[in-house]
Each structure stands twice: as structure tokens, then as C-alpha cells.
Amino acid sequence: MTQFTLADRLATLPPYLFAQIDKVKAEVAARGVDIISLGIGDPDMPTPDFVIEALKKAAEKPANHQYPSYTGMLAFRQEVANWYKRRYAVELDPKTEVLTLIGSKEGIAHFPTAFVNPGDLVLVCPPCYPVYAIASRFMGGVVQELPLLEENDFLPDLDAVDEATWEKARCIFVNYPNNPTAAMAPRSFFEKLIGIARKHNVIVVHDAAYTEMYYNENNRPLSIMEIPGAMDVAIEFNSLSKPYNMTGWRIAMAVGNASLVAGLGKVKENMDSGAFQAVQEAAIVALRDGDAFLAEIRDIYRKRRDTVIAALNKIGITCRVPEASLYVWARVPEGYTSSDFVTRVLQETGVVMTPGNGFGAAGEGYFRISLTVNDERLEEAVSRIASL
């Protein structure tokens, strides 16, 4: 069989982080080891019944099995606008400032196609979701890193970026609550970022996939669209995947500056055929009726977080107590690199975790635990780690 070479843009990519982890996990499982996966952030709990029932009803409508609108059902976009108004007190025009996505990863990956030309400077903040940099490089963008350091509360040091860089920058990707560090950004950070972006005409791309996964009602994560002036320069990606246990459904939204939303929409109308309408109808129900469910989910994850933090502290592993996200971000024990520690834990105990350096060099010295198994399995996982 002929072996064809990859395009240069693919040939230079490092292996995708989670694909590498899956390979080692399969090798360990083949030895008969009981695997506890704390790697990928994929909720273990089912989609709520009321959303599934809504999908069943929507799937019975013949019209929903035809091609959907490229921009998404207006009814879904209206419900997104309603939810933003209720949750963040943000006014959105559902016709021009909301776009339906086939999952937020799809929208984030397509965004540079619309707005990044070869040679454009793109700022990313590692440790972070690898797609920001990969998608930008695919379009010929030049990626510059603003590292997230623990001593700066895992916020990029905006003051360390000189005026010339801001003038040259096309866009900056930020993500709060943050994956993988679980950090939250205060209003003052967003205000400063939006001020800089407006001054230098920089696009702010905010990945807000974890805003509903918080543990303190008195410190709820912000939407960047709450910040005065954000509508001038920002687009925000949000998703139903994590809060509603709908990762496999692939339904999300982009909101914000109308020209940014329209540009992304133009890419999508040429690259995909929209989200299944029955899923959009079910998502309407989730956004409209899901507040009580979300409160229950937050309680479950809060207990899991506390279980992991207590167990890690007991064996001498230190970490901050996260106030949001599905993750615990902890330092590796002295004498290990991130990859060495995570690989040893997986090979000797069957516990899957994510090495911090998989999110960029700034993540070296850390590992990430996903809170996506029940308390009993979490305790068992940390017990196995302690046995090393």
C-alpha cells in the first residue's frame, strides 16, 4: 500500500497529548491492570433525563433531520441570549452576536481561519489548551507565549508585554476558569485586558467552557462580555459539554462582537453544515431549565475536589484549592519531571493523570487530575499513588 506524506503543517505537529496518554493506558490495561482515568476532563455522570427527553421529542420531528441552518436555530441563539441576560446581565442580539457551534473546540479551531493571516502575531497563555496555538499555526500565525505562573495567580503578566508587541498582536487567547490550572480571573484582570485590547485593536478570544463549574456562589466566574467595552474587541466561547454532561453531543456557542461572530460564521458555512437541530432543541431546554441540575452537579464536584485535596495533602503533595473547573492542578514530588511522574504512576498503579508539560513548557513541574470519577475511585487512586 502506498504511504502518502502528510502536509507540512501536520508533519511538524507534536503528537496530541491525550492520544499519547491513551496509548500508554492501553498498554497498561493489556496487562490486566484496573485503570482509574483521571486524565481527560470528560464527565462520568449522565446527561440529565429532562434533556434526553427533550432530544427524543425533537428527534421525532422530520424537519430536524434535514440540513440545519449554518448559524444555528434562531430559537437556540435566542435562548443563549436569554441565558446570558439571566446569568451575566449581558444583552446579546441573537441574530448577529450569537453563533451555534458543533462544540467549542470546533469554533476555537476555526477562529484563526477567519482572522489570522500568515505572519500575524497570536498571543497564547500556557499552560493552556493546545488547540489555541495549533489552530493559529495552521493559518501561518506566529505564536508568542505569555506564561501563567503560580506567583502571579496563573494570570498572564500583561504589563510584561511591551507596546510594540501589543501593536503587532492580532489576537490573544485567554481561558478562565482556566484549564489546566483551575485559576479564576478577577474583574480587574478582564478590565485591564479589554482596555489594552481596545487601545491596540487586539482581538480577545475568551474560552469560557468552565464558567458554570464553580464551587462558591459568592465568587462566580465572570463572562468577559460583562466588561464595559468587551463587545468592541472580544468573542467568547461557551459550551454545554461540561456543566450538563453533554461532551458527546457537540453543542456550544460563540458570542460577542458582531464582526467576529460573522467572520467565524463565514468560515463555518464553508466548512460544516451546522449542528443537528434536535440537539439544539434539547440544548434550549438545558439552558432554560437546568439551574437546579447545575447546583446538584456543583455539589458533587465540590465533594470530589475536597476528597482529592485532602488525600493529596496527606501524602505531602501540595496544591491550591480550586474554586472552579473540573480539575486539581498540583506540583509533582521533588525529583520528578511532569512526564516522569505521570508515566510512573500510570505504569505502576494504573492511575491516569495528565502531565503539566502537555499543556506547554510553563506546565512543567505540575500534573492535572480530573474530578471525573466517583469519591470511592478518587480515594482509591490517591491511595495507589501514595503506595509508590
From Swiss-Prot:
Query: Which GO biological process categories is it annotated with?
Result: lysine biosynthetic process via diaminopimelate
- Binding residues for substrate: Y16, G41, K105, Y129, N179, R368
CDD domains the UniProt entry points to: AAT_like (cd00609)
> One GO molecular-function annotation for this sequence?
L,L-diaminopimelate aminotransferase activity
Q: Could you tell me which pathway this protein works in? A: Amino-acid biosynthesis; L-lysine biosynthesis via DAP pathway; LL-2,6-diaminopimelate from (S)-tetrahydrodipicolinate (aminotransferase route): step 1/1
As its record notes, the protein acts as a catalyst of: (2S,6S)-2,6-diaminopimelate + 2-oxoglutarate = (S)-2,3,4,5-tetrahydrodipicolinate + L-glutamate + H2O + H(+)
- N6-(pyridoxal phosphate)lysine PTM sites in chain numbering: K242
Q: What is its EC number?
A: 2.6.1.83
Q: Enumerate the Gene3D superfamilies for this protein.
A: Aspartate Aminotransferase, domain 1, Type I PLP-dependent aspartate aminotransferase-like (Major domain)
UniProt keyword list: Aminotransferase, Pyridoxal phosphate, Transferase
> Binding residues for pyridoxal 5'-phosphate, per the UniProt record?
Y70, S104, K105, Y129, N179, Y210, S239, L240, S241, R250
Q: Cofactor(s) for this protein?
A: pyridoxal 5'-phosphate
Identify its protein family.
Answer: Belongs to the class-I pyridoxal-phosphate-dependent aminotransferase family. LL-diaminopimelate aminotransferase subfamily.
The subunit field of the Swiss-Prot or TrEMBL record says: Homodimer.
Function per UniProt: Involved in the synthesis of meso-diaminopimelate (m-DAP or DL-DAP), required for both lysine and peptidoglycan biosynthesis. Catalyzes the direct conversion of tetrahydrodipicolinate to LL-diaminopimelate.
What is the name listed in the Swiss-Prot or TrEMBL entry for this protein?
LL-diaminopimelate aminotransferase
Q: What is the name of the gene encoding this protein? A: dapL
